[in-house]
Amino acid sequence: MAKKVTGYLKLQVPAGAANPSPPIGPALGQRGLNIMEFCKAFNAQTQKEEKNTPIPVVITIYADRSFTFEMKTPPMAYFLKQAAKIQSGSKTPGRDAAGTLTRAQVREIAEKKMKDLNCDTVEAAMSMVEGSARSMGLQVAE
């Protein structure tokens, strides 16, 4: 018989840097989960990732206080800022450009994010990436 799911918890944790301090510890602790068990398992799975890359994680909490977690790909903004070599997006997107991206960079980001996006083709994923880039004040060069 399958375990009864009591809830889900979504967190964004830096790769290889999960520790019991806030915000991870209190979020897991108030749900009665073993904080150190999660931290060790998460850090072990993110060893191959670049340090401090933000990794979205969805934790499934069961009635017996056990859990499983699923890691997603890093946020699109992280990839866009890395590709454009900027620290943050434009304060006034649409007016001031924070940087530029090439179509090849957009395609590369779309292929990385494809499994987490709600689309079937790379072209559809590319249009989502371009929309996110525009909202950050990045221009896409042909």
UniProtKB/Swiss-Prot annotation:
One of its GO terms (biological process) is translation. It holds the Pfam family Ribosomal_L11_N. The keyword Iron does not apply. One or more lysine residues are methylated. Keywords: Methylation, Ribonucleoprotein, Ribosomal protein, RNA-binding, rRNA-binding. GO terms for molecular function: large ribosomal subunit rRNA binding; structural constituent of ribosome. InterPro entries: Ribosomal_uL11, Ribosomal_uL11_bac-typ, Ribosomal_uL11_C, Ribosomal_uL11_C_sf, Ribosomal_uL11_N, Ribosomal_uL11_N_sf. It comes from the Bacteria. GO terms for cellular component: cytosolic large ribosomal subunit. SUPFAM superfamilies: Ribosomal L11/L12e N-terminal domain (SSF54747), Ribosomal protein L11, C-terminal domain (SSF46906). Forms part of the ribosomal stalk which helps the ribosome interact with GTP-bound translation factors. Belongs to the universal ribosomal protein uL11 family. Part of the ribosomal stalk of the 50S ribosomal subunit. Interacts with L10 and the large rRNA to form the base of the stalk. L10 forms an elongated spine to which L12 dimers bind in a sequential fashion forming a multimeric L10(L12)X complex. This is Large ribosomal subunit protein uL11.
